[in-house]
From Swiss-Prot:
Cross-referenced CDD domains: PoNe_Nuclease
Gene Ontology MF annotations: nucleic acid binding
Name assigned to this protein: UPF0102 protein CKO_04542
Coiled-coil regions listed in the entry: none
Organism: Citrobacter koseri (strain ATCC BAA-895 / CDC 4225-83 / SGSC4696)
């Protein structure tokens, strides 16, 4: 449900959809989008309230590591790598009725 809402929201901001719920060994990427020539790996989070830090705070270092690994595998399957493909990792956080878009929230150099 939240991935579909995130996709619509990001498309309204000009991003183009590539894939959803991409599973590779050890992880899953909620959305893969294109922003111009940049491949964007999107983690979608929802929390009812900002108590305990809200949605964005739930993307831990461990989760970031899994997303990086999953993206690395996906890129390899599509003849790419972090060295050859312009990409970034965004977090789209739904907290109650608020939407926050954290562009380039983390990267493979973090």
């Amino acid at each position: 449900m939240w991935e579909a809402a995130a996709r619509r929201w990001l498309e309204s901001k000009g991003l183009r959809f590539i894939a959803a719920n991409v599973r590779e060994r050890g992880g899953e990427i909620d959305l893969i989008m294109r922003d111009g020539k940049t491949t964007v790996f999107v983690e979608v989070r929802y929390r009812r309230s900002a108590q305990f830090g809200g949605a964005a705070a739930s993307v831990t270092w461990s989760k970031q590591h899994k997303l990086l690994q999953t993206a690395r595998l996906w890129l390899a399957r599509h003849n790419g790598s972090f060295d050859t493909v312009d990409c970034r990792f965004d977090v789209l956080a739904f907290t109650g009725n608020d939407v926050e878009w954290f562009k380039d929230a983390f990267n493979d150099r973090s």
